């Protein structure tokens, strides 16, 4: 007899699952007999417990397990017979009216939606482009020099000079201070320190504190008021005004390494050739620019696809993805060293909007890939792995690392599929190219 599938909504369905009681009972009896061979009870050797006693002890548990298994199997059979594309897990409830010879359950579930993707020619995408020139290379060299900065005591002669005649603390100097802070003449936790180092101008300290330290010479001190921000991480002092006295103990001026052969060697240029160094920096910047532009345009393409697509999103899939995002958040907390991160009370509701977008986008992409043959080809995956490996010291080892793990390879395959989708959409959409600076590109990709 054909199963009747009821429509309860746009995606929600219900079907009745019927299980003959004699079939269920046979399975229960078989499992109890199997269980009796290993079950232990006081006063009996293993495998010698009377079958009746085993049944009395475990019948309820075994019946529940058998019904669960049989219902799942029957639902799978029915869903295949009725060509149902079930989204998520069904829920089963016993029917109020039961036949004498069968168990009857209502299975309620959702099905995958029909996905309608509009005309790609109407999609609008802005594609960022950037060029790497001497200015970008020089800025990168400046960053690299600052990463290798070392300090010398101001006023003391050394191989790099004495830092100038002015021995007062300036922005960029590393200073070492003692300080004492009080609120209404009472010291507070964290308000006192000795030999405390920081670099002026880095923003590590509150602005009033840095301003007070600027211009001081070794041995000088200054007293000043400092109002803690209302959102300051130290709740006991947030919003309050403290009086600090800071004493300058040491002032060191920054010396940046010269851009010479030794500097080039420190960047991995074995012969110290500056032209090679700049060429390699340019190549790395171009690779980074390509990665960032691809990321930005991918997000634009995904947004454009969502705008022109129509579909209902199964709640079951959204709920599953919410839980997945909760677990990802807990893993992130654990990696940051947060205690008991795996049990952190993170409400799934906070990911509702993000999960709905992810699920909706996944359904749209799946439809687009299937309809247009955009699956990842093995040679495409290998090309992306090779490209990724180029930025490492031993590319061959990185390639082996990828191909030794199916999960890592699957992640790269998903990346290739997304790239295929992006290229396909860009070939049909209204695309506007926009030249942006590398700095603007970096800022945009950080916000994406």
Curated annotation (Swiss-Prot):
Keyword Signal: no
Keywords per UniProt: Cell cycle, Cell division, Chaperone, Cytoplasm, Isomerase, Rotamase
Listed EC numbers: 5.2.1.8
Disulphide bridges, residue numbers: none
Function: Involved in protein export. Acts as a chaperone by maintaining the newly synthesized protein in an open conformation. Functions as a peptidyl-prolyl cis-trans isomerase.
Family designation: Belongs to the FKBP-type PPIase family. Tig subfamily.
Domain notes: Consists of 3 domains; the N-terminus binds the ribosome, the middle domain has PPIase activity, while the C-terminus has intrinsic chaperone activity on its own.
Entry protein name: Trigger factor
